[in-house]
Amino acid sequence: MQRLIRLLVCCLAFAGQASFAAVDGKAILEKVDKNLTPESYEMYRKLINIEPDGSRKEFVLYTAKQGRDSMVGLFLEPATDAGRTTLRLGDNMWLYIPDVGRPIRITSLQSVVGGIFNNADLMRLDFSTEYEVTAVEEQGKTYRLSLKARTDAVAYDRLIMVVDRAALLPLTIEAYAASGMLIKTLRYRDVKDFGDGIRRPAVLETDSPLYQGYKAVMLFAKIKRRSFRDEVFTLNYMSRIKELR
């Protein structure tokens, strides 16, 4: 009888370990990152800020990323912003304005485009670089991941990410401040094949209870794997990012 009990206990322990392994939050988040973008790539984006009266302001950006925490951006449109560039190295961010002629430090919660998307959204690193998974729930065809910022320098203290279980792509993300206040909700949609094994949402929409009636949309295009020289991701290269295109 005691042998049977020990056997049942062992079976239950094994089943628990198997269940935990099946919903390994860290592995899920890393796969989400891999499915959204390669480790090193270039892409184009259109950003659309929509005001309560329906008026819009649009931006077109070229972006390049190398490794886990190096990223540059180049404004192509509108003409008033064309030539401006951005650089992110880890938690540090800069904006280069041709008329100023030197890089200016900016923060993750500011926005170089105005509207709801902040600099952390525009120059987003892999989620697994900035957040750790604190809980995972299986909810039908989705996973619900609770994420906690690894450092105080991260724009959002906590994220709730709903992930499509089959595609391992994000569906929605709720971003919270340390106080528990909801800052914004991000919604991914319109999954497209960008080629070379990259299949991901082409549209990201956001709204915020802090900006009632305002919306913002990010459209992704021409995502391609590409490697760059290390000098591209330096302050001295910010005035030359246009040479990458």
Which residue stretches match the model-derived regions?
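Extracellular or lumenal secretory-pathway regions
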Residues: 41-42, 67
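Flexible, processing/modification-adjacent segments and terminal tails
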Residues: 22-40, 46-48, 55-57, 80-157, ...
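Bacterial N-terminal signal peptides
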Residues: 7-17
